[in-house]
Structures are given as structure tokens and as C-alpha cells.
Amino acid sequence: MGSKFSEYISRAASVEGFFLEQAAITWDCLLNYQSSHYIKGNFLEIGVWKGKSAILSCLHANPEETCLLVDLIMFDEAQELLKNLHSNSNFYRCKSQNFWQNEANLHQFFSSCRWIHIDGAHSGSACFNDLQIANQLLSEEGIICIDDFFNPSYPQVTAAVFNFLDQFPFSLKLFLCGFNKGYLARPYYCDNYLRYLLENFHNDLSMINYSGKITLYKTSRPGDFNCFGLREYQGKDFVGLDEDGSKILI
């Protein structure tokens, strides 16, 4: 499908919301990876508000893919904007737990979503509940993105994520974090995303004139914690092990 980043920046510029540019470019690269590897599936966003991040999901969605957009407080202009971008969008003005309980046909979306963004209520219990929903809907090759991960304003979100990962280690793993987001995938598919980040992520950034702006950190060995971290550019594309910064092990 190709990068949608430039179009996203243009369309989202006037939309109120909180979505860092570096997070948007990371989404764009990961969604391009999915498209180039023929990974298809639906999209779920819990917490839409005015639609700033959902714009990027709608731009990447293929016509046959459904965007499920859930928010108790969803603005009419957001609904109109997103529907115009992707006509195959379903809107649910409710709490996420009510969406889960009341949508009679939700079973058709089980294990079908390739991209899920959790940005709903920010209590620990709400985040844990949303992860339960996401775990049911995520496909084998999909990604769950958690908003405000490692944000010191919401430590309960980070705690809820690690609590969930501890309880369900065979369901999800953290493979990437940074710029206010955490990224989870199925354990047996994480290696593919880790390899992409190591081998092609920065190439993709350079193709859309975004090189020299993000550094990937991999300061641990796979047996310790197999996850990349994203930071603003530190003069190099990668930082590896503390004992040898040139060594990246996945």
C-alpha cells in the first residue's frame, strides 16, 4: 500500500488530540510492513475522541477491512471525518466493556484484527479490561498498541500491561516501546517484527525523508528481555548492549 505518513500529517494537522509525530511514523512503518507481507485484518481503536490517531488507521485500511471505533465520547465531526476516509467503519458510542457485551455480531471479529490501539479510560482496571478484549480480537500476526505506556502521569497503565503479560505469557509479548506507546504481538510472531526493526525500519524511515530522527535501543540480550526501545535521535540509528553498543541481539 505504501506510506501514508505525508497524507496523515496533512489530514491530521487541524485535528485536536495527542499523537506524537514519531509515534505516527512508527505506526506507518509497522502498518507498511504488514501490507508488504500480505497481512490483512480489521482495525480496532478503543478511545477515538476526535479521531487523530484513527485517521492513520483508516488511511491504511483496505476496503474489505473493517475499522471498529469505540468511544463513549465520540465527536460527530470525528465520525464524519473517519467515515469519509474509510467507509467500512463501525462506530460504537459506549464504554469498551459495553461494546464487548452488547455487540451481538462481535464473534465475527474474533482473531481478525491486525491493528488494535488501546487509548480508552486510563485506570489500571480499564486498561486490563481492554487488553482482554484486544486479546480476543487480535489476529495471529497483528499488533496491539497501548497509549501512555511508560507515561509517568499514568503509571497504572504500565502496571496493567505488565500484569496482563505476566498472567498470559503465551498470548502476548512486548516487542517495542517508545514515544508514549507500547507494542504487543503474539509470541510466535514477535521475531518477525524484531527482525524488521533491526533490518529495515531505518531504511523505511529514509524512504519517507525521516532518517536521523529516531534511535532504536536494544540494550539487553534476548534471554533477558527481547524488546526494542525508541528514543529521539542520539547520533546513531542503533544503541546496543551496554558492554558493546555496536552489538544488537534479537
Over which residues does each language-model region extend?
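A short alpha-helical cap/connector motif
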Residues: 1-117, 121-145, 149-250
